[in-house]
Regions:
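A glycine-anchored, Pro-Gly-centered beta-turn/N-cap motif
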Residues: 4-6
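Generic short beta-strand segments
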Residues: 9-18
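Intrinsically disordered, low-complexity, charged/polar segments
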Residues: 48-67
Length: 67
């Protein structure tokens, strides 16, 4: 299923910060806001972009809840 454009709360699937860092998700751990637009997922904290990836990767590696 393709992730639709919108704003989500993204939660890392990793159980701890070390696992998140090993997978390159430390800037998102434990959660961050995620804006999906035109197949790009942009993660931010306090209005500052911290990471980005394609929407398919985000859907596979994070728990995303529409907000």
């Amino acid at each position: 299923m393709k992730l639709r454009d919108g704003i989500y709360m993204a939660r890392c699937k990793e159980k701890n910060a070390l696992s998140a860092a090993a997978n390159g998700h430390s800037l998102v751990y434990p959660q961050a806001r995620c804006t999906v637009k035109r197949d790009m997922a942009i993660f931010d904290r306090d209005g500052k972009e911290v990471w980005r990836c394609n929407a398919g990767y985000a859907e596979l590696h994070f728990v995303l809840e529409k907000i």
